[in-house]
């Protein structure tokens, strides 16, 4: 099964993000926008994982994060990963709490590499993906094509989740496989 590990957001934060993006979503249907319920910060993409290996990954999550405290983050500016100067991925950066998120990702990276998962070559950038360029769209965007004003409150991240991702023609469906609650 296709899996990834991520930080889950409170529903009210997802809703606030979507309200802020509403006009851009209407104005730019050429982009593939992430659905509201699927908003998250990926810590580690695992790819295809044999079913029998999934419980061991859940056990590792428990081992790494059980007893950790919930932490506060604040999302920042809308930014883009580019390909030849054009927007490939549109994302929201982390203004506060990014160091803690990096620490979580690094701990996962170290632990999961011992289980045979490939280490990421690129440096981890904590971010929330909000849209991707469609491969076959004729419309291309530059970073300054976006005017998104975010005014989101700080919020607590209190769970780290192992997700199963099922790809469908209408978009991915995420299912929680394992949830590790962070303490108050």
Task: Describe these PLM feature segments.
Residues 1-184:
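Histidine-dependent nucleotide/RNA phosphoesterase domain, centered on the 2H-phosphoesterase fold
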């Amino acid at each position: 099964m296709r899996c990834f590990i991520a930080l889950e957001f409170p529903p009210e934060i997802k809703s606030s993000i979507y309200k802020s993006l509403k006009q851009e979503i209407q104005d730019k249907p050429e982009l593939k926008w992430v659905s509201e319920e699927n908003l998250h910060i990926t810590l580690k993409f695992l790819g295809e994982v044999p079913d029998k290996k999934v419980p061991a990954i859940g056990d590792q999550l428990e081992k790494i994060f059980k007893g950790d405290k919930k932490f506060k983050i604040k999302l920042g500016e809308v930014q883009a990963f580019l390909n030849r100067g054009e927007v490939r991925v549109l994302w929201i950066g982390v203004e506060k709490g990014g160091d803690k998120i990096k620490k979580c990702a690094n701990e996962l990276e170290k632990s999961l590499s011992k289980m045979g998962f490939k280490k990421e070559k690129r440096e981890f950038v904590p971010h929330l993906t909000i849209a991707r360029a469609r491969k076959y769209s004729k419309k291309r965007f530059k970073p300054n094509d976006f005017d998104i004003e975010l005014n989101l409150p700080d919020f607590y991240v209190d769970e780290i989740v192992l997700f199963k991702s099922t790809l469908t023609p209408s978009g991915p469906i995420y299912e929680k496989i394992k949830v590790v609650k962070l303490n108050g």
